Each structure stands twice: as C-alpha cells, then as structure tokens.
C-alpha cells in the first residue's frame, strides 16, 4: 500500500503540472463512465472494452487531480429528491459484467482513492457452478474469471460499491428475423416457429428475467438492486417502465453525453471507455473536448434492388468504403401496382419481412445508423408505427414535417415505447419557419435541399443542426462535389445524397466520406 501511495503522490504532482483543470459543469450535471475488463500490464492484445490496470490508475489520479468528484448512486438520488446538491464536476463510475478483475484490480484502487462505484452483475453468469464454463457473449470462459459472491459481499461491505443489475440472462442475442440475425435480447421480439413474440410475451420475458436477477442479488447481498444497467446499453421505454416498477428507478444506457438535472433517471447516459485510451484521450473525452462527427448521409431504397440479398451485399460494400453515419432507408416497395411494406404488420400489405435484416446488416457491417424514411400519411397510423418499432432495429426517423409538429411528436412517442432513443431528421416540404430551430431537440437535424435559398435561411450558430441534401439524379457528380467543398468552407459540415448512385460518383464519395478528411477543431 505504501508503494501505491507513493505512486499516487508522484502521479498527482505530474498531472497537476501538465493538465489544466476542466471547465465546471452546470449545477446538477454529472457524467457517467462505463468500464468493463481491467487487464494486467503484461496482457498482450486487449478486447475492445478492456483497459490496462496502469491506465485505470492513471485515469483515477487524473480525475482527482483535475477536481472531479466521483459520487455514489445514493448522492445522485438524494440530489433529485431535495437533498444536498451534487458537487461541481460530479462523476459516477460504473463497471459492467462482474469479471474477477473488478475485485482483484479495481477494488484496491477504489480503497486507495476512496472512489465509490457501481458494479453491474449478470446473474446467469454467476450462477454457473465453480469449475464450469460461462458463455460470455459467445466465448466460453471459466467461471473463475468472474467474481464470487464472497467477493461481491466484501466489496459491498466497504461502502464503496453498489451492486446493480445487468439482467439475469439478457446479455445475449436472440433470433430476430427469418434471415437468422441475432439482436439484443432486451429490445428484440424473439422469432421462433415463424412467429414473433407478442407484446404480452415479450414483456413477461423481461419481467421474469429482471425479477430473477433482483432476487438473486438480494439473496446473496441482502439488498435488492436500485439500478439496471442495460446490456449493450439497449432498452426502450416499456422496458424502462418495467424496471422502475420492479424497484430500479435508475437505468443506465450507452448514450454519450452529460446528464443534467432534467435527464430522466431511467435514461442515464454513459461514456463507454474503450481500447485502454491514452491519458490525453481520456482527459479530452471527460472534458467534452470532442465534438460529434458531422452527419453525412445517403438514401437507400431497397425497392430498387432486383434481388434483396444481392442488392444489400453491393450496398454494404459501398457503405463500408464511404462510412456515412446516417443511412435513410425507405421501408416501402410497390408490388403489382400496390404499395406494400417490408416489415410485419396488419395495417398495410406486407411484401416481405426484410427491413429488420436490412437495417441490422447496415448497422453491424457498415457501421451506419439507420433512419427510416416515414411517409407523411403514416404519421397518423399509430398502429403501423408501433409495428415498425416492434419489429425493426433502427436509430432514427426522417419525418416530412417541420420541427415541433404535433403529429410528428405523437408518432415519435408511439415508436419510442418499443424503440428508444430515436433521433429525428425533419425534412419539411414547406418553407422553414423562423422558430423551427428552437423546436429541434438536441441531436435532431433539419434536412433541407442544398440550394442557395435554403443556405440563406440558416441563422448564425445553427450550422450544426442542418443537413443539406443533394439530388444525384439531377446534379452532376462534379457539381455536387464542388458544392460540398463550398459548404464545408462556409462552416456547413453536414450534407448527404438523396439517393445511392451505383457508379460515376467517386468525386462525391471523397468529399462525403469523413475518412478522407482531416480532423478539424
């Protein structure tokens, strides 16, 4: 311990000299950091979510040196219930999965720094008998690589560790569609025997799982969990409501961002710590020095593919080269002169159950979040929108209305019961009103045709909330490429294509792709 204390004093002195203090957060604000495995310094290659023990110690020292105040879950709850306010630069530390290193490597650091943390446990893994093997997201590893219940109780007795639920057995994929994709169990309707789970069966499955883990944790620690840490960060409003009902008012996601006094407790945001970042990278992330990447979009119309798998394969190849971070996808096709949809519903004719497969492949293989292009006449059909959200995995929607439109907000509320959170790209057909900008939620976009008239409509300071769209069917590639360069020079870094041309657009790709551009401040 003396060696550790000397190490801490030396490192703190260095950090005070080298790193400036971060800017103060607003009253009531706090950030949450999400850690997983903590490996030894001698480990070779690391998993994506692992950090080295030495890097973690340096990060803890930097937090202390920079004036951050790790707080407990109880302090956050007290601050929301009229108790003492959170300190400036408040921060909550969380460790997911319950690997053995949280006891052998993290716990000694917690005692050294006196940092409180939340440790999230998956009951199914801990219920494997000693000497058995745990199916850890498809990889068999020994049960001994996870904490024992004796370890858990020792950490809990310290007063520094609060135990949260990470579900009993939702940390896995389940069959999600006829094509064989597996998707997160907490938000996916299981597909079996050619049918999907109903609302009742889905919610009963979640209730049984969450209740079982609560009972298991209470059995071994004497205290039921007050927080659910959603596996893969995936949940929806129905699942969040269920967790609250079962005694877990706090829910944790993997949405980036600062939690403010207005952030709902069941929807707390967390920064995922990945790939054992350097101390500088860690500091920049915590101090919010990294702005989100600008939106770059393409529009994909599966109805144009003669064969779905062949068309999807070609599209994925192009997306991997381009790497857009918004893929607008049309959910409709026309068959025999009749409009039909690509997902299960009783509200309209169904051409095929393919949209979930298409959206999942685009997200997983190309890394492009999918936004569903909603026809305006769908906004009033809440049953149709609920079916879309039940059966398709997507990140957002494009709505052909102005920001704040009541029909759009009601439609969004319906979908977020089953698919949350949803970003919105508003694409109004009419002229943009002066108050449209203030009606945008954080993270939402206003999509406008790339014209000089629309460029003139954008108020000062709003460039980061508009996405200009070019039509590859009417504008030559060289002209689009020049216009994109002019937009970026004028501070408008968000643009896209209202289509997905097959060939001849190399000049556009190099301007659209973030990979080909330098990092800008």
Residue ranges and their predicted role:
Residues 254, 258-259, 325, 444, ...:
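Substrate-binding cleft of secreted/luminal carbohydrate-active enzymes
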